[in-house]
Structures are given as C-alpha cells and as structure tokens.
C-alpha cells in the first residue's frame, strides 16, 4: 500500500507541476521602437531659416555726382553694412562673391558692379565693396568675404560706395541698382 501511496503522491506532484511547465512555454512577441532625428549642419543668414538665403538689401541713399570717387581711393561717402551668419554644427564656412564678369561687373573691372537700373539710370557710375574702413576693394568675381573652419555666429562687414566707371569721362545723374551674387558653402 505504501507503494500505491507513493505512486499517487508522485502523480499528484506531476499533475501539479504540469500547468507550471505549460505556462513557462508561453511565447509573447513585442516590438522595440527606436526614434530620433538626424540633422544636417546648417547656416542661416540674417535670421533666415536654414537653407533659405534672403535677398540682402543695401540702400546707399543719394549722393551728389561731384562726390563720386574713383575706385582706387578710400570712399568718403559709403554705406557700412553687416551680414550675420549663424551656423549650427557646420564646418569650413566660406562666403564667396560670385559676380559674373561683364554680366554683373563693368567690362574689364571685376571690382565694380554694373548699374542695371531701369527708367532713368545714372551713367558712368557703378558700385564697389570695400574692406571696412580701408581703400581695398573686393574682387567681386572671386573674392572671399569669410573663411572659417569652425563657425558659430559670424558677422561680415563691408563698406559699399558709388564709384566712377574708369572707361567713362562724363557721368550723369540718375538711379543706380546693382546685383551681386554670392555663395555660402559649408560642410
């Protein structure tokens, strides 16, 4: 009888353990989700959104014809201007002037922008950009305004002035407008 009792006890133990083993074999599946965002280095100009380069307007105002100087001299009547560039994560920032010779500049004069004003344009007058406070004008076709390996917030300054076209002896009064393409590049 003892043997029967032992067998019943063993059967009861196995029967009790059977639900435990079937519960341990249950499989559940799930998903681990990973999220994030990869941002590109960016630079903005004068508060614009990244990748949008705004039109930068420089109003030179009015000047008497007799005050317009030749390119070689430091202008006495100029407009100081600055452009702020803010970069996040960018490297090797370069701001280059990209005027097209004879399209944006006077023929043979890579330092003088051509007057493209319509209506009543001034004749014999262009616009030049100078290093701030100096008589050194920028080459508008291939000049570099800024070159910085680790930029953050950078300010470019320059002086803009009306200048005489050296190929013209007589200038006339009128409107002046010029466009200067530039390029902002960074890694």
Label for each model-derived stretch:
Residues 2-6, 21-187:
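Mature extracellular/passenger domains of Gram-negative fimbrial/pilin and adhesin proteins
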Residues 10-17:
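Bacterial N-terminal signal peptides
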């Amino acid at each position: 009888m003892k043997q029967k009792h032992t067998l019943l006890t063993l059967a009861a133990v196995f029967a009790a353990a059977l639900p435990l083993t079937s519960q341990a074999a249950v499989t559940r599946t799930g998903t681990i989700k990973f999220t994030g965002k990869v941002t590109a280095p960016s630079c903005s100009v004068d508060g614009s959104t990244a990748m949008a380069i705004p039109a930068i307007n420089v109003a030179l105002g009015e000047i008497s014809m007799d005050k317009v100087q030749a390119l070689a001299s430091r202008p006495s009547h100029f407009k100081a201007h600055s452009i702020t560039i803010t970069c996040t994560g960018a490297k090797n920032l370069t701001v280059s002037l990209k005027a097209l010779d004879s399209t944006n500049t006077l023929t043979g004069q890579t330092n003088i922008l051509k007057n493209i004003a319509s209506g009543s344009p001034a004749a014999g007058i262009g616009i030049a950009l100078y290093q701030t406070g100096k008589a050194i004008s920028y080459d508008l076709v291939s000049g570099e305004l800024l070159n910085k390996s680790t930029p953050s917030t950078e300010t470019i300054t320059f002086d803009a002035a009306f200048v005489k076209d050296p190929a013209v002896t007589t200038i006339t009064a009128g409107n002046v407008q010029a466009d200067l393409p530039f390029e902002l590049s960074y890694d």
